[in-house]
């Protein structure tokens, strides 16, 4: 069939591709430990699930405004502002079914054909896809392992030009777990003001940090008016299947993004939004407990990976991923990922699922039980001993 250029460059996400392979092996009788998909292993917290169930029983199953229910927008504005030391209004908040619309729609609203967009590589695959759909020119900036997988600022400075329209940040990062330091954010902010570009800050993992909070570029002088914050409920509140996210941006841009929602998605399910309201306004002890458990799993996984021959793993500061360097194994990331799946029954992702600069790395998700993580380490150790 003859398709438009907007879709001919799109490719599947590597995580779903690997999941399909792993499930095929499971269907054939092989036991698989799944460390490839980035979603919490715990169910949605009980108070949130109960709020959603109650909303359905009470008849909250009708359309809502495209930008979301006003009480939820206000609650998010207050909560997100308090956590960042900023003041947001409800008019700056737009609600959608998941966080991805707030990667995609601001890009569609801002990027013109031929505009250049700088994004992290390795990084979330949707970044490059949405830039291309918008007609922009994607320019990858490498992440430096020796600087906690922060931007290579020498490359970044070379990429910035009068054609730069948007820079995408992700901190804490998928796939690396790296947190961008304040000094790097300050350099990017200075460049944004000097060259007059926007920043799209993907902060979906902002609550999942293990040592110190992840700073937001929106807090720096002159940046609130040129920053879009993308966040959501999936990772923090174990609500991946509920599909609830939001963007925070200047009101004029929020109006345009709302129009894109109106003419595409329509609105977000009302009962999902009511569950989200409980998530924001209800007790946060479950989040704190989950973060503490993730920290414990992270430490055990990193220690175990560093005992494997040819593997070197930095301790991530946020998110729930590790991104070990496997160049010492002498094979490509794709080969090692396939080998571990077939020989060890452990599903994980090659670094190249996140861009060309992911070569030499693997991504493993530790949002899984400690028992499975320890079993996976034992299986990997056994399999790698046989590697030629």
What are these regions (language model features)?
Residues 7:
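Substrate/cofactor-recognition hotspot
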Residues 63-64, 288:
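Short, surface-exposed loop/turn segments at secondary-structure junctions
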Residues 71:
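Active-site proximal helix/loop that lines the substrate pocket
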Residues 3, 11-13, 18-21, 25-32, ...:
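PLP-dependent class I/II
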